[in-house]
Curated annotation (Swiss-Prot):
Record's function text: Catalyzes the transfer of the diacylglyceryl group from phosphatidylglycerol to the sulfhydryl group of the N-terminal cysteine of a prolipoprotein, the first step in the formation of mature lipoproteins.
Coiled coil: none
Membrane-crossing segments per the record: 17-37, 59-79, 95-115, 129-149, 176-196, 202-222, 237-257
Protein's UniProt name: Phosphatidylglycerol--prolipoprotein diacylglyceryl transferase
Length: 276
């Protein structure tokens, strides 16, 4: 049995300014996005499509806005709509916590659509480009969850079960944050990076991301404690699982569509449409 280390959520104090670990994890995710994005630009099939370093800076700006706005609205709409309906001003108190990945994901999709319009590229061409880097941010975020001792797992008698003092029950639980770090972070990054190293039909990389994230998240939810204010929903599945199922189905459909489209076109190289 292990006990959570109880890290100080504040990493650095600079005068009256308190820099929290969770904020540093966001920063780490953005830095990794830029780092691996520059490596991706150097891949021959990406360079041939005209991707440049300045695109990364703009994509990061749009992406950050999408994550923050979408993540917050997703939490409000998916998890606590009735509460925020009666306390609308609480929606703006982002510093008090309350972000949802699925909402942030939708926010990023909208942001990348706007970026695609600005750059006169196809939306799926943009999402295919960024998909391999997204797990970097997911991995950093899960480490932030673990440092904060939040989003702990369900009770377990496994040797690596961990007591999270914030849970208030002194029961060993799955360190589900680390499961998600390993699955939707590390493993998904490796899968996508290797898959995207070669030219693929437009939409295929995005589809593999949806399948991979949805699958890893769906599996991890069996070890993660459901939100106390929601519990388990229909068929004893959590909200995270119900939101992940459409991602898996849409991802499968996208991969099938992408390869069928390529086969119909008779092209040996992937299709790269222009225009939004």
């Amino acid at each position: 049995m292990l006990i959570h280390p109880q890290f100080d959520p504040v990493a650095i104090h600079i005068g009256p300014l308190a820099i929290r670990w969770y904020g540093l994890m966001y920063l780490a995710g953005f830095i990794m996005f830029l780092w691996f994005g520059r490596l991706r630009i150097r891949q021959p099939h990406m360079a041939a499509r005209g991707w440049a370093a300045r695109d990364l800076d703009d994509m990061l700006f749009f992406g950050v806005m999408g994550v923050i706005l979408g993540g917050r609205l997703g939490y409000v709409l998916f998890y606590k709509p009735s509460y925020y309906l009666t306390h609308p001003l609480e929606i703006f108190k982002v510093w008090e916590g309350g972000m949802a990945f699925h909402g942030g994901f939708l926010g990023v999709l909208v942001a990348m659509w706007l970026f695609a319009r600005l750059r006169q590229r196809h939306w799926l061409e943009v999402t295919d480009f960024i998909a391999p880097m997204i797990p970097c941010g997911l991995a950093a975020g899960r480490i932030g969850n673990f440092i904060n001792g939040e989003l702990w797992g369900r009770p377990t008698d496994l040797p690596w079960g961990m007591i999270f003092p914030q849970a208030g029950d002194n029961i060993p639980r799955h360190p589900s944050q680390l499961y998600q770090f390993a699955g939707e972070g590390v493993a998904l990054f490796i899968i996508l990076w290797l898959f995207a190293r070669k030219p693929r039909p437009m939409g295929a990389v995005s589809g593999v991301f949806l399948i991979g994230y949805g699958g890893f998240r769906f599996a991890a939810e069996f070890a993660r404690e459901p939100d106390s204010f929601l519990g388990l929903l229909a068929m004893h599945l959590s909200m995270g699982q119900w939101l992940s199922l459409p991602m898996i189905l849409i991802g499968i459909a996208m991969v099938v569509w992408a390869y069928r489209r390529q086969a119909r076109s008779g092209e040996e190289r992937p299709v790269t449409d222009s225009g939004a």
